[in-house]
Amino acid sequence: MIVGSLQMILFLPDGYSCIDGKSDIITGIFHFMPIQFCLVFLYSIIFKPIEKPIAKYILLLIVLAFWLYANKVEFSHRYACWSTYSEEEININVLYKSIIPCVICIFSFYMGIYYFEKRKKRDIHN
């Protein structure tokens, strides 16, 4: 949740949502991060028995897809709705503006997974 929140902070445009005129970035984080937590939690329950390396990459892809979805929704509500963006322009802007935050946060997320896997293996061997 922390990495997802960081990703949203890095991506989200400043300003308020045009839906209610008062929702800020923290509101967006509180809206999407519980969903991310549930996705990761369910994934870990379903794929826990699978110890194959592909499982963690699938998790990273799921999280990345969720972040892009959240970025699109928030971009649409905080920036595009105040202007005249087509759906294609929204998608292009979201992908372009998501590159750096998503790369930074996916790398951090991966390093967290790697750290906890190594720690778990070390604890088993001790």
Task: Identify the meaning behind each predicted range.
Residues 7, 80-121:
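Alpha-helical membrane-associated segments of multi-pass integral membrane proteins
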Residues 1, 52-73:
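Transmembrane alpha-helical segments of multi-pass membrane proteins
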Residues 10-31, 70-98:
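Interfacial non-cytosolic loop connecting adjacent transmembrane helices
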